[in-house]
Amino acid sequence: MSHGTDRIALPPADAEKTNLVCHFCIVGCGYHVYKWPANREGGRAPGDNALGVDFRRQVPPMQLTMTSAMTTRIRDRDGQDYRVMILPDDDCVVNDGLSSTRGGQLANVLYGDTPVASHRLRYPRLNTGDDWVDTTREHAADLYAAITQRVLDSEGPDGVMFNCSDHGGAGGGFEFTWGTGKLMFQAIGTKMARIHNRPAYNSECHASRDMGMYELNSAYEDAELADVIWSIGNNPYENQTNYFLAHWVPNLRGQTRSKKQERFADETVGRGRVIFVDPRRTPSVAVCDQIGDADNVLHLQINPGTDTALFNAIFTYVIDQGWHNESFIADHTSGFEEAREANRMSLEEASQITGVSVEAIRRAAEWSYKPKDSGHSPRTLHHYEKGIIWGNDNYRIQASLVDIVLATGNVGREGTGISRMGGHQEGYTRPPYPGPRPAPYIDQEIIKGNGQILTVWGCNAFQTTCNAEQYKEAIHRRAGIVQQAMAKARGGSVDSMADAVHEATQRDGGLFIAAVDLYPTAFARAGHLMLPAAHPGEIELTAMNGERRIRLSERFMDPPGEAEADSLIAARLANALRRRYQEAGNEEMAERFAGFDWESQEDAFNDGFRMAHEKEIDSQGGETGRLVTYQRLREAGNNGVQLPVQEYRDGELVGTPRLYSDHNFDTDDGRARFQPAPWNGFLSPVAKQKEKYPLWVNNGRTNHIWQSAYHDQHIDYRTGRFPMAPLEINPEDAEAYGIANGDVVELFNDYGSTMAMAYRTPEIKTGQLFMMFGYFNGMVGEVTTEAVDENVVPYYKGAWADIRRIGSMEEYQRSVSFRSRRYT
């Protein structure tokens, strides 16, 4: 492992150079990859190394971001050893040469001289009943097809279930979603699918879409141009680091004032303001407090689950003051009066519900919507994330916020918008989902014993679902039935094994589980078949970031063993099913599995993303996706193009910086729709726990750990910081329960219990806790309820529990830092 070394080999001037978009958060920072034979290295003179930097003298500050974590050694399938260096791209408009703690470790997650390499899946693996053994791609695909064929023939498509990602980045991309989606929805035809982070096949933004607006409608540049930025249920410094540092912070410091003056010559402009809506003082709030002051940083420290009341009061106050945009409402919207009446709430009532003072709510409204000295309305950019998405009735909260945006016309103009901040990157291209709305609640279907085969693709619901304890119990119990049947069928043919599995699922209530992943996750180990996937760099992959910017991550190394792209795994499974139906003489079913004759990721991209103008395809590229090719993206580099593409002109793809600048919204009549969203209290299961238990258990991400820690759990640098999921607790509460820093504690309620590592901090209110989400050692989902909104979007953040001290861990006390993470 190269991390922590005191010497870095420089790439020679002729090193291979390719483009790579960071695997991780939605910002999608651009990086350059340098690859060269391991027995060579570049010189210190600028002409002797590929970086063009003079290392013969001290490199000036901020000229280069380079650490030992950004370089490693790999070995390709030809047996040749290479060095790889991955550095941020100074010319990328997304990150402006910045690197986050996640992107800065990209070299550390390659298959090579790295801590993760020995943990990667290299070959398909089969559970023989009492052990896991390697097998071939062909054997694995044939067994999967044989079992799926039996379920389809006996139960129909709804017997085949999927837990499947729907995003871009390391876990997928447009090729991934098309390959898996074509298999699930077109070939198999199932509606029994759920998405990686929620228990049904739905959108996280149904309300925004129903009201006529796609949820990623602004440009990152808008954060530089806004008068006010709202950050609602979002922690951008930790979760969208370089969007925050490269685009928000300069505005808050007043460094974009001249840019605003050039764009908006007649308007009053100044340094930007930011308003946070969050129950805790996050590191993002702390950073902004240090950069700004009380005149441009406001934190509305809201009571949990009360966002709708806050937004309705602001909506009412703005209208009562006459700050709404009457011409925009009249010309481009419908339903205003209904929403105005339904959402009416006074500042005083909202203050009682939310715990935020009347003065603070009024100040937020004045900053954001009161006309400026020039008479112009403020340009206000509204960003939200999991505090709303996983909040108390997703649909209602989101609708109440979008109502404010529509009332004030803050969409489609520079410096405005209503966009989610996002977690991972995006990359959606699939056939239409064949199920209803609301979609089936797949977790509950599995708990009730439905479904016979479950494919877990690029996700791990054990660590990321709600009501996880009951869900995992059902998975283990039902998978165990199949495991026993497979043990008894050892030594037989593929068909005899498939017969045994089918009998166990149909007669005895078992569940056959196949997993496609980079690693043998806890969910995969609970199952019966594992298929090894590849990630960016090992394959070519396209995805788009939070401003709809699509780029091509280029291949620069071989995947390990028989790992391959997810799209090609989907094709392999589909082709195996087609062969079986052809052999059975069922040409009708065989034809459903046709059209998977892909040999590369580019073939899958061309079949899906580039064909939305001819086929019935739901694609973030839209009908103009046909203009996008791998070669054109390769030429566009790390700046890519913002979707939808307008045209290809003079050798360049021309994109769309922000949506709805023409005020033509995504509705039948082109008018945006107000949505009544009255405050309605808490979802029932959560309300019951709130009455019974004293502590609210909030949850979310931290800067150091990405998603379910699928890479990070294998890296000592990460697990040394957080050996167990940290639980922030106010010192007063900690004293009351006898809890010290580093103690192992147990949270418990009617839904289950989980363990965590105590982390005392005054930045969290008494009566509240904050636990890191999705970790492998301590899972907050085990104390969350099954509560969902009308579209089966879960209230992950709605958990109340009690706490007890388990004891002290000497190693935690010795090696883990409990200094404040607020950096100020």
Task: Say what each PLM segment does.
Residues 1-321, 357, 450, 457-459, ...:
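N-terminal export/assembly segments and adjacent metallocofactor-ligating motifs
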Residues 116-139, 146, 153-157, 171, ...:
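N-terminal leader/propeptide and maturation segments of large enzyme subunits in energy/redox metabolism
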Residues 176-280, 284, 308-312, 397-541, ...:
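Extended redox/cofactor-interaction regions of prokaryotic respiratory oxidoreductases
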Residues 288-295, 340-346, 376-384, 451, ...:
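Short acidic (Asp/Glu) and glycine-rich catalytic loops that position anionic groups and cofactors
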Residues 294-301, 532, 549-560, 714:
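Short beta-alpha connecting loops at secondary-structure transitions
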Residues 314, 332-439:
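Active-site phosphate/pyrophosphate-binding segments
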Residues 537-559, 574-576, 761:
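Glycine/threonine-rich phosphate-binding loop and adjacent beta-strand/alpha-helix elements that clamp
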Residues 568-624, 712-728, 732-824:
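Long, contiguous, secondary-structure-rich segments that constitute the structural scaffold
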